[in-house]
Amino acid sequence: MLRRKARRLIACLVMVVPWLIWLSAAAPAQTLERIAATKTIRIGYVPDQAPFAMPGPDGKPTGYAIDLCSQVVARIGQTVPGLSTDYTQLKLADAFASLAAGQVDLLCSALTITLKRREIVDFSQPIFVTGASALLRSDSPQDLRELFLGEHKISPPRSPSLHPFAVSRVGVRKGSSTEAALSKAIDAGKYSAVIVPYGTHAEGLAALEDRDIDAYFADRALLIGLLERFPDSSNLILGTRLLTRESYGIALRRGDSDLRLLVDRTLSAFYATAGFGALLRKYFGPEAGQLEQQIVAQSAIE
């Protein structure tokens, strides 16, 4: 009796499991079909990532990554008349899970492409090239100032040149790729530095001003944007040396190859226009020329 039940259970699993696998693989491919049927594309963004994604004066999101995603929306709109955009604010800690669960179709913010993140989502070709650096006070420990403001090259993690990490409290955005890189560097060197995670960049900058930490780490492009919007940044100095080198991308659901191809084609076409240089100048000023060369050099071709 038990054997017959076991055989029936196995037979059911043999029939059901392949169907479930097909269903999970087929679901992402239906994103463009759903967009066409509902005439709505759902874009998620992290609101405190100026100048990549931030609330505008009218409450609607704006920023470099948002504008690039608008190019994608316009491309889809060529075949879907009356297409509307539904924006959703997300916390960085929840953003990738929300995308994987199908709550949004695209993530448009300052999103570093990492292998760990690619376990649950896919990314477009790079939309930006940057790296993590430090924001310091004018009276931050001298060793930290020499390391990130000096002329010498940053040494490998185990080098004595990273000794200042051993006596410092350093802040970082919780859940960011910079947090992972900073933790790895400190662990590799067996330093006793304290990493203090913050929920938002604004909290981290406030802690730096209040001397709760000696330095705040984030992608350099984000730090530039934060300095421009911080009420009193005269006492803060942006590091010129990079701890990491990273690329940003637009995030999509894993396996959503049709939408990813459309996004990549849209980006490559836009990179070849004068409008791309104008967009970079709008958000990054004099650094636009160098940024354009770096991004275009990594772009996909037809």
Positions of the model-derived regions?
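Bacterial N-terminal signal peptides
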Residues: 11-22
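Sec/Tat signal peptide C-region and signal peptidase I cleavage site
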Residues: 23-29
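Extracytoplasmic small-molecule ligand-binding "clamshell" domains
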Residues: 29-115, 119, 155, 197
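A conserved helix-loop-strand patch within extracytoplasmic ligand-binding domains
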Residues: 30-32, 78, 82-87, 112, ...
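Ligand-binding clefts/hinges and TM-proximal coupling segments of bilobed small-molecule sensing domains
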Residues: 36, 153-186, 234-236, 267-302
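Periplasmic-binding protein-like
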Residues: 47-48, 128-143, 220-221, 227-267, ...
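Hydrophobic residues within well-ordered alpha-helices
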Residues: 72, 99-100, 208-209, 250, ...
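A ligand-binding cleft/hinge motif common to bilobed small-molecule-binding domains
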Residues: 94, 108-120, 181-188, 202, ...
